[in-house]
Amino acid sequence: MSSYAEQVLVCTGRDDWSSRIEDERGGDNLAADLKELFGRGGTYSDPYHNISVLNSSFPSSPPPRTQAQSASAYLLPSFKYIPFLPRVSFDSVQALAKGYLLPEKLHPAHDCLSPIHRDRLTRKTAYQRLLLGVQDVADVLVLICGHGGRDPRCGIFGPLLRDEFEDKLAKARLRVARDAVRVQLGQAEDTTASAHARAIGDGAVARVGLISHIGGHKFAGNVVIYIPPASRTRAGEQHALAGCGIWYGRVEPKHVEGLVRETILGGRVVEDMFRGGIDSKRRLLSI
């Protein structure tokens, strides 16, 4: 796996996409807009602050005004959910980029840049107020490469693994959510991490989704498991992988029960399939 500062999961409600997701036609394409900003040669392109943009099968949250066109996105490992990105102008994309995706502090290699250039590449938290309903993510997220438009192996493995994970998670007493996240604006919500502290398996929520290409088709099936920062084990202890994203490769349906038991419930990495990982401080994990 390559290092990244943030993975942006665009909620498309679809299971597959064109080989290059930025080339998708037939409607709105938030991934293309973000790649225009953060891709090679983009306005905010920074080799020391990689933003990985992926499409996902998760559905977007219904907007407050049903006639408005909107998109949703997950930010990981920040564990933020952006429910409403109005798609009537580029303003919401800029707010997402400037308020959440740009680095808070630039790499020392940028010290030679002009003050104006450094300022343009640095996060401005004031932009966060332009995006409504942003929440901390308290759900376990299981992401499976199902990008058949890029590689047929992923198109075969993805749906099979999704079904198997949903089955085994339910048997482990997690509630598997398939519907869109519903956000009611104006409600007083405590979205701090401490508010979501819960033992995984004790009625906790898990979401299993297909995602676009993450590299390494030879490792199909590719799976990334994100454990929310406030997660605890059933024994009430801090989950050893809380706030982390764990990457696995060559996962087959027969391996899923073990991954649920060891990684999601037990906080242990399965070495045989481990491709890498990332923690909440963006440090790469290895064994």
Where are the regions a protein language model picked out?
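Histidine/cysteine-enriched polar flanking segments
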Residues: 1-287
